[in-house]
Curated annotation (Swiss-Prot):
Heterotetramer of two alpha and two beta chains arranged as a dimer of alpha/beta heterodimers. This is S-adenosylmethionine decarboxylase proenzyme. The modification Pyruvic acid (Ser) is found at residue 63. Its EC number is 4.1.1.50. It is an enzyme of class 4 (lyase). Belongs to the prokaryotic AdoMetDC family. Type 1 subfamily. The keyword S-adenosyl-L-methionine applies. The active site is at residues 63, 68, 83. The keyword Lyase applies. Disulfide bonds: none annotated. GO terms for molecular function: adenosylmethionine decarboxylase activity.
Length: 117
C-alpha cells in the first residue's frame, strides 16, 4: 500500500534538562534534524516559556518537525511529519538523540494518506 507521508511521534524521557530549556540549542537541533533527513527548511520558530520550557517548529517544504519540552520532568514530545520520496524522517533521529540525550524514548510510526493501489 502506498502512502503520502510518514509521521513519527516521539516520546523522549530523562533528557538533558539544560538542553530542554535551551532555545538556541533547540533551534540548532531542529535545523540539524531537518538537514539529516534530507528535507527542505522553510523556517524555524521557537518560543521560550517562563520559568522554563521551549516549543518549536521547523516548517519544511515536506511538512514539519515540532518539539514541546518540559525540563522540570526531563521530557520532550516531538513530531516528525514528512511527505515525498526523497525524505526519510528516521534519519533525523540521531541529531535529536545527540542533543537531548534521552535515557529512554518511544517512537510511533504512522503512515499518512494510505492509498490502495
Amino acid at each position: 500500500m502506498k502512502h503520502l507521508g510518514k509521521h513519527l511521534i516521539m516520546e523522549l524521557w530523562d533528557c538533558d534538562k539544560q538542553a530542554l530549556d535551551n532555545q538556541a540549542g533547540v533551534e540548532k537541533m531542529l535545523e540539524d534534524a531537518t538537514n539529516s533527513c534530507g528535507a527542505t527548511l522553510i523556517c524555524i520558530r521557537t518560543h521560550k516559556f517562563s520559568p522554563q520550557g521551549v516549543t518549536g517548529v521547523a516548517v519544511l517544504a515536506e511538512s514539519h518537525i515540532s518539539i514541546h519540552t518540559w525540563p522540570e520532568i526531563g521530557y520532550a514530545a516531538m513530531d516528525i511529519f514528512t511527505c515525498g520520496e526523497h525524505v526519510n524522517p528516521e534519519d533525523a533521529i540521531p541529531a535529536i538523540r545527540d542533543f537531548l540525550k534521552p535515557a529512554k524514548f518511544d517512537i510511533i510510526d504512522i503512515k499518512r494518506g494510505s492509498m490502495v493501489e
